[in-house]
Every structure is written in structure tokens, then in C-alpha cells.
């Protein structure tokens, strides 16, 4: 039984806790593993036990995982009350663009710097980036950093008020499309078919922007875990987190297959 199944916080003792400076902005990053670098960004409401479980799976598959603290209490079990407060703070933060018309979240510039540092430390052909929920689209924006060659966009929820929108400014959208076309990057993405926060309209918008470079995979909502932590049960209220809170850790399960596909994608891009 892991921490989330027991309703406990995760102490994160198997990761080194670093203070990482990018252009004078310092954030906490949890690092563990050996091999090519993968930046795994948290979903709302923070670096939960489920996010850390995914990070450990990636680490154990032969990667160095970097988990930046962007919001919430690190390692905390996601309760409804605390999670709602984290969302409220993030929605008005200068680092994020949660609503339509806001363009690209400024924090992605810092994340690109983290990817550069990870590549410098780990070497290899490049770095992977996994975004989840609130940070889902950040993995795509990070391809503006040349070292990022394996973006995974999981259930991207921004902008919150436009189901067909993308959390990207026009100039960045053009630059991302050009980078993807120029370097032959495939963008891997996942959602549940009945997710209200990441709809088919959003995946259609990605397809319009990226064409065949967008590999959007859709799982049946009925495959989602039925007893997720309180934040997901009471606030999210829909199948959403394919590889974290709504993952079912059983052999052959569609969500576990999605996890395996992500790891295989990272291995194909980063271990070559």
C-alpha cells in the first residue's frame, strides 16, 4: 500500500532536495535516479503521493527525475479543503495563466531553464518533460528549449474557462509548431473520454496546431479509479488524472498501460 492508498503524506526521503536557481529565481526541486533527465511537473494540488509514485516509476525505469515544487505542500495527501485553496492561489499567481486570453504561463521560462540544467547534468540526447493537469501544457511549451525532445502532455486543464483553448500565446504557439516540425518531435498526450477539465475540443485544438505530431490517446472514463483522494473526488469530480490519482495499479489495466507507454516513449527518445 502506498501513501495515497493509506491517506498519508509522502516524506520524499528517497529524493534529494535541491534549491535550483534559474535567472535569479530559486525553487525547490526533488531529484532522484540515474540516466537521462526527465522533468516531471506536479498536478493540482501539488507534489502528491500519486505524483511521487509516477516519479518513482520513471526513475526506476532508468531516468533521473526532477520534480519541481510549483504550488501546494510538497508530499501532502490531496484533501479537498487544502486543495481548493492551492487552486485559488495559483489562479491569481503571476506565474500562471489559468484563464483564456492570458497566453503562456511565465513559469515555463523557469522550467525551460531547469531542463537545460538537467541536460547539462545528465547528458544524453536530450530531456523529457511530463506535464500533469494544471501543468499539462507546460510540457509542450518546454519544447521551446532545444534540450527538450520528449514532451508528454497529460490531461492538460488550462485554460480553465475555455474547453477548446490552449494555454499558449500566439507567438509561442507558432514557435512550438516550428520546433516540432523541424526536429520531428512527437507530442504524446492522454485524457479520459469524459473528462470535463480536458475535453475532446482541447485535443482537437492540439491536433490543429501540431497535425500528425500530436499523438493524443483517449481512455474510457469507466477505467478511472473510483476512489481517488478527496480533492479529486470532491473538487475535480470527473475522471481526470490518467497516470496519478485515477490510475488503477493492476496488470493489464488501461491506465497502467498508459504509464508503460509513456515510459517506453521516454526510453525511445532519451536512451537512443
Task: Indicate where each model-derived feature is located.
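N-terminal cap/leader regions of alpha/beta-hydrolase-fold enzymes
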Residues: 1-272
Amino acid at each position: 500500500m502506498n501513501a495515497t492508498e493509506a491517506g498519508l503524506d509522502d516524506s520524499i526521503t528517497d529524493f534529494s532536495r535541491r534549491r535550483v536557481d534559474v535567472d535569479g529565481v530559486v525553487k525547490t526541486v526533488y531529484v532522484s535516479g540515474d540516466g537521462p533527465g526527465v522533468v516531471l511537473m506536479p498536478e493540482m494540488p501539488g507534489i502528491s503521493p500519486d505524483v511521487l509514485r509516477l516519479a518513482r516509476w520513471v526513475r526506476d525505469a532508468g531516468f533521473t527525475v526532477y520534480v519541481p515544487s510549483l504550488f501546494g505542500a510538497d508530499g501532502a495527501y490531496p484533501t479537498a479543503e487544502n486543495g481548493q485553496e492551492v487552486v485559488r492561489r495559483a489562479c491569481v499567481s503571476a506565474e500562471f495563466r489559468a484563464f483564456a486570453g492570458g497566453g503562456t504561463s511565465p513559469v515555463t521560462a523557469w522550467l525551460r531553464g531547469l531542463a537545460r540544467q538537467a541536460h547539462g547534468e545528465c547528458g544524453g540526447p536530450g530531456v523529457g518533460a511530463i506535464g500533469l493537469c494544471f501543468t499539462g501544457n507546460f510540457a509542450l511549451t518546454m519544447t521551446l528549449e532545444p534540450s527538450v525532445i520528449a514532451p508528454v502532455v497529460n490531461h492538460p486543464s488550462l485554460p480553465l474557462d475555455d474547453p477548446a483553448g490552449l494555454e499558449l500565446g500566439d507567438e509561442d504557439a507558432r514557435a512550438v509548431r516550428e520546433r516540432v516540425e523541424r526536429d520531428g518531435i512527437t507530442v504524446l498526450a492522454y485524457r479520459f473520454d469524459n473528462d470535463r477539465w480536458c475535453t475532446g475540443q482541447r485535443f482537437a485544438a492540439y491536433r490543429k496546431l501540431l497535425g500528425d505530431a500530436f499523438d493524443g490517446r483517449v481512455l474510457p472514463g469507466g477505467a478511472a479509479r473510483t476512489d481517488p483522494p478527496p480533492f479529486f473526488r470532491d473538487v475535480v469530480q470527473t475522471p481526470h488524472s490518467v497516470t496519478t490519482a485515477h490510475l488503477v495499479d493492476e496488470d493489464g489495466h488501461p491506465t497502467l498501460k498508459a504509464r508503460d507507454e509513456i515510459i517506453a516513449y521516454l526510453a525511445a527518445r532519451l536512451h537512443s
